[in-house]
Amino acid sequence: MVVELKNIEKIYENGFHALKGVNLELKKGDILGVIGYSGAGKSTLIRLINCLERPSSGEVLVNGVNLLKLKPKELQKARQKIGMIFQHFNLLSAKNVFENVAFALEIARWEKNKIKSRVHELLELVGLEDKMHFYPKQLSGGQKQRVAIARSLANCPDLLLCDEATSALDSKTTHSILTLLSGIQKKLDLSIVFITHEIEVVKELCNQMCVISSGEIVERGSVEEIFANPKHAVTKELLGIRNEHADKKSQDVYRIVFLGEHLDEPIISNLIKRFKIDVSIISGNIEELTTKDIGYLVVRFLGNTAETQRALEYLNALGLQVEKLKD
């Protein structure tokens, strides 16, 4: 495991219980999206991974090493293998792009003759080799974040922490940054933890996700699994799943999830013909994830109980996930 958080508790001096019994693992090469509402504990969690925050109790292991047991110099060295980017970039305004990236190497005591070539390599990686003499005030938000990404990768980390790294960007720039991170992850075989409150970020970038609410991890799994079958109420809210279509006049309203090959099959049409039952399609959409597409339909079966039951058994036999929406 690249990251292991074990039985983490975080209680601040004012008594606020920010994290409660958190256990979390990150495998090599995974991109984990940590999503939740404001105040849920997301930023506290990510800052524990590189010990910018220290837990009240529990263990923080990165590549098998308990960071909480390291001496200050040992911790400083370990942090060099953990890159981090933030919402507001944290660039040095008095230094140009080249100098901002080089600064991370100078702190790590790289040899001067190696710094120049490394900075050029990093700026080429993030597409800013033509901006090396620009200052932060001359850059767009997306360009500033690209500089921050280059700086975070300076010391060849195997883990990248992203704390709301796209929250200050517009949707087009967000897409470009996520595309960049996805490409970098593949090229460098990075593991990434990405804190966000935007479900679109998780859909576009991540293969794993966890949902945090009131300091607790309430759901954890692959993005595909959770989008297909969310369990917790907070997860359903974040995914935009509501029960407004279910009412007391009609209890036969269902949400059907279509995965992979089923997306192109005329399943509802076949069901209608086979069981002579009317189906009212209330809503539908397709989510494009990093691993595969997932389709959703909210339908009402307009038949008697026996007909509806046969239709449900047919859908279940096909391996579809069917959830009855409650009022």
From Swiss-Prot:
Positions contributing to ATP binding: 36-43
Keyword Calcium attributed: no
Family matches, as Gene3D superfamilies: 3.30.70.260, P-loop containing nucleotide triphosphate hydrolases
Reaction it catalyzes: L-methionine(out) + ATP + H2O = L-methionine(in) + ADP + phosphate + H(+); D-methionine(out) + ATP + H2O = D-methionine(in) + ADP + phosphate + H(+)
Subcellular location: Cell inner membrane
UniProt main location, coarse: membrane
Limits of the ABC transporter domain: 3-239
Membrane topology listed for this record: Peripheral membrane protein
Presence of keyword Translocase: yes
Family: Belongs to the ABC transporter superfamily. Methionine importer (TC 3.A.1.24) family.
Subunit-level organization: The complex is composed of two ATP-binding proteins (MetN), two transmembrane proteins (MetI) and a solute-binding protein (MetQ).
Name of the molecule in the record: Methionine import ATP-binding protein MetN
